[in-house]
Amino acid sequence: MAGPRRLNEPRPVAVRAAGDGTPRAVASVAVEAVREEWLVEDRWWTPRPLRRHYFELALADGRALTVFRDAGDGRWFRQRA
């Protein structure tokens, strides 16, 4: 039996972004609106600090989705769907 699963575990996602980094499409679904965006910086005192740029999005298919870009390696993840 597997152990407990973490809720809202970040999962990799394909994002097409504008030149300024704002998401334009997520998994080939157009972004209708960016509802909110924020920057999280944590663990700055460690050898591997955490820096993420979050976006709360409204997608063309009606879904609301939160994604972030990891500033360390540039990869995109979905946090909540």
Language-model features: locations:
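Non-catalytic peripheral regions of nucleotide-handling enzymes
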Residues: 1-81
